[in-house]
Curated annotation (Swiss-Prot):
It comes from Homo sapiens. This is Protein smoothened. Belongs to the G-protein coupled receptor Fz/Smo family. Residues 1-27 form the signal peptide. Residues 255-262, 336-358, 424-451, 546-787 are cytoplasmic.
Length: 787
């Protein structure tokens, strides 16, 4: 997110410094060649005086004076101040042979008035050199203190062109401890700063060596019309982004019970970050807020914030915009990681994100905080009038590259990796396991793959645009600085040309940043926020708002409710103790157990449950199913661990073997069952009455399901007193306790000796049921079972 950058270079010259250029390197060329630049012919005496001044002064009459011919003053005013004496000499001015020429040079030097602090200290020096007091053929020499006072405030003169030889603080021209008449003159020290510089007394606002002047608050590289155009652009896209992200947040909150699921809820936090960021961008449109944010109290641009003597409005806007942006991009990485891991766990009961959500929050909120504190510590927050905000690296693009481009580039690499892996996982599930997917699940996978592809394309495109715009700024910033420098010098020409009646040039900035590039850069930032909000632009969102409206207005919602079978079974098992006391009660399901799709409906896969519809017959038999699954057991039945043998002392060890019955075996068993039924109708075999077990007493406990009328798989084995269970040999036999004559033995069942029977009837030959697993095995082998 780059905004317009002012062309601030390390070498912006003083506006009035062009005076030195117009002088033709004043003092140097004149002193070395002996040629004057003033108008009119030079007298031989004037040339001799200049030559004497340069080659070496004659022996001084005293420590603070030098012999020189005096001439009456033709101009009794020097730089706007009246001189208290009436005679002067041109001996000390190495670039002037006459008073007229010296007066013209002073006019050119007056361009330094645009550097207020330099102008305040250089006026006495210039008057003491160009129009010194001369009395009795003796000229006063300026003191060394007067010369040294100009070196600091006027450092830009030394840096740009260098001081002339006759203005260098040498002991022969500027002796120590001398008083000068000029030092008693009161000069007008109220200098001014030429546009685009403004006057300021705050040293932190001074621009480089131009003490007393700072860059104006409004970016000088753009016109007022361009400022207004950019502000309207930011207002439009900022408002659209804010409204889209706000709608997303409201949709999540309206159905928070179903929306608060990972990974979909991560989109809530991403949109929250971009919503807060858009608020930071739109804050400038409050009355007077933009100037308060990007401008200092002295009218200069905010640079190097935070500072102790300025308000915190700039820092607050920076924290809002930058922290929200960095948190949003980190949440994007977490989102792609959550998608990747969730897609890998499809079709299983494994919850890959369980226990990791706290680490997600720790990472996404702490990392941007560290970056924000680091930027504030190095004081690299700058304001920009075009964008209307404060951000990092407007002045120094290296900090912008390190704190903006580097994190975004890392996000692009890591997030892109997880996003591509997630799409590949979905494609693998769809192509390698087509028979395991219901039509609804396959449709969701296709929709999600398409949306992830579009989303990834937009994310990569926006990041690429951001990088391109920033590189455009980096590579052209030096050229913009040179163009701005020429513009400043041109403005100085206008200032000097007015009093000297020289031609006035037409000043304009030749090379400057493109406003279109700045708009494209901002579009990438706002477009990312809009793209994040599109995940809730689904039909499920319309249903959420419909239910919310009905709830708020008290209207009835005629939408058919869907309750997942898994939720009904879980609730039935949770109420098994109540069903034990009252087997006839019916289960009621409140609206809180009704499951709706969240706003991000495309990410809710359920490969194991192709349909969520529940028939009335299925719902009525939930309690029966609970009993058949062993959740409700009679109080007189003992429950022991699975596969724990409890054989009677006088019988062989028998127990049911858990096994999976293939469909072919079930068909065979069904046919055998039918044959046994037909045989019973012809010749029923009644068991002896003495072998019947006693009738159970009346009880409210629901009856256990009847065991199937078919052969059971029994493991039989015998061992001696010294043998252990593991040393014995086990064989699978058919249950010999059925009264019917057994048909020919199946080839897949081995033969074994039959143990002694103890009962007759449908449950004859079976030992006591010792565990819930036995109940479930019995149910599994029942061909008439619905579950």
């Amino acid at each position: 997110m780059a905004a317009a950058r002012p062309a601030r270079g390390p070498e912006l010259p003083l506006l009035g410094l062009l005076l030195l250029l117009l002088l033709g390197d004043p003092g140097r060329g004149a002193a070395s060649s002996g040629n004057a630049t003033g108008p009119g012919p030079r007298s031989a005496g004037g040339s001799a005086r200049r030559s004497a001044a340069v080659t070496g002064p004659p022996p001084p009459l005293s420590h603070c004076g030098r012999a020189a011919p005096c001439e009456p003053l033709r101009y009794n005013v020097c730089l706007g101040s009246v001189l208290p004496y009436g005679a002067t000499s041109t001996l000390l001015a190495g670039d002037s042979d006459s008073q007229e020429e010296a007066h013209g040079k002073l006019v050119l030097w007056s361009g330094l008035r645009n550097a207020p602090r330099c102008w305040a200290v250089i006026q006495p020096l210039l008057c003491a050199v160009y129009m010194p007091k001369c009395e009795n053929d003796r000229v006063e020499l300026p003191s060394r203190t007067l010369c040294q006072a100009t070196r600091g405030p006027c450092a830009i003169v030394e840096r740009e062109r260098g001081w002339p030889d006759f203005l260098r603080c040498t002991p022969d021209r500027f002796p120590e401890g001398c008083t000068n008449e000029v030092q008693n003159i009161k000069f007008n020290s109220s200098g001014q700063c030429e546009v685009p510089l403004v006057r300021t007394d705050n040293p932190k606002s001074w621009y480089e060596d131009v003490e007393g002047c700072g860059i104006q608050c409004q970016n000088p590289l753009f016109t007022e019309a361009e400022h207004q155009d950019m502000h309207s652009y930011i207002a439009a896209f900022g408002a659209v982004t804010g409204l889209c992200t706000l709608f997303t947040l409201a949709t999540f909150v309206a159905d928070w019970r179903n929306s608060n699921r990972y990974p979909a809820v991560i989109l809530f936090y991403v949109n929250a970050c971009f919503f807060v960021g858009s608020i930071g961008w739109l804050a400038q449109f409050m009355d007077g807020a933009r100037r308060e944010i990007v401008c200092r109290a002295d009218g200069t641009m905010r640079l190097g914030e935070p500072t102790s003597n300025e308000t915190l409005s700039c820092v607050i806007i920076f924290v809002i915009v930058y922290y929200a942006l960095m948190a949003g991009v980190v949440w994007f990485v977490v989102l792609t990681y959550a998608w990747h891991t969730s897609f890998k766990a499809l079709g299983t009961t494994y919850q890959p994100l369980s226990g990791k959500t706290s680490y997600f929050h720790l990472l996404t909120w702490s990392l941007p905080f560290v970056l924000t504190v680091a930027i504030l510590a190095v004081a690299q927050v700058d304001g920009d009038s075009v964008s209307g905000i404060c951000f990092v690296g407007y002045k120094n693009y290296r900090y912008r590259a390190g704190f903006v481009l580097a994190p975004i580039g890392l996000v692009l690499i890591v997030g892109g990796y997880f996003l591509i892996r997630g799409v590949m996982t979905l494609f693998s599930i769809k192509s390698n396991h087509p028979g395991l997917l219901s039509e609804k699940a396959a449709s969701k996978i296709n929709e999600t793959m398409l949306r992830l592809g579009i989303f990834g394309f937009l994310a990569f495109g926006f990041v690429l645009i951001t990088f391109s715009c920033h590189f455009y700024d980096f590579f052209n910033q030096a050229e913009w600085e040179r163009s701005f420098r020429d513009y400043v010098l041109c403005q100085a020409n206008v200032t000097i040309g007015l009093p000297t009646k020289q031609p006035i040039p037409d000043c304009e900035i030749k090379n400057r940043p493109s406003l279109l590039v700045e708009k494209i850069n901002l579009f990438a930032m706002f477009g990312t926020g809009i793209a994040m909000s599109t995940w809730v632009w689904t039909k499920a969102t319309l249903l959420i708002w419909r239910r919310t409206w009905c709830r708020l207005t008290g209207q009835s919602d005629d939408e058919p409710k869907r309750i997942k079978k898994s939720k009904m079974i879980a609730k039935a098992f949770s109420k098994r103790h109540e069903l034990l006391q009252n087997p006839g009660q019916e289960l009621s399901f409140s609206m809180h157990t009704v499951s709706h799709d969240g706003p991000v409906a495309g990410l809710a896969f359920d490969l194991n449950e192709p349909s969520a519809d529940v028939s009335s017959a299925w719902a009525q038999h939930v309690t029966k199913m609970v009993a058949r699954r062993g959740a409700i057991l009679p109080q007189d039945i003992s429950v022991t661990p699975v596969a724990t043998p409890v054989p009677p002392e006088e019988q062989a060890n028998l127990w049911l073997v858990e096994a999976e019955i293939s469909p072919e075996l079930q068909k065979r068993l069904g046919r055998k069952k039918k044959r046994r039924k037909r045989k019973k109708e012809v010749c029923p075999l009644a068991p002896p009455p003495e072998l019947h077990p006693p009738a159970p007493a009346p009880s409210t406990i629901p009856r256990l399901p009847q065991l199937p009328r078919q052969k059971c798989l029994v493991a039989a084995g015998a061992w001696g007193a010294g043998d252990s269970c593991r040393q014995g040999a086990w064989t699978l036999v058919s249950n010999p306790f059925c009264p019917e004559p057994s048909p020919p033995q199946d080839p897949f069942l081995p033969s074994a000796p039959a143990p002694v029977a103890w009962a007759h009837g449908r449950r004859q030959g079976l030992g006591p049921i010792h565990s819930r697993t036995n109940l479930m095995d019995t149910e599994l082998m029942d061909a008439d079972s619905d579950f």
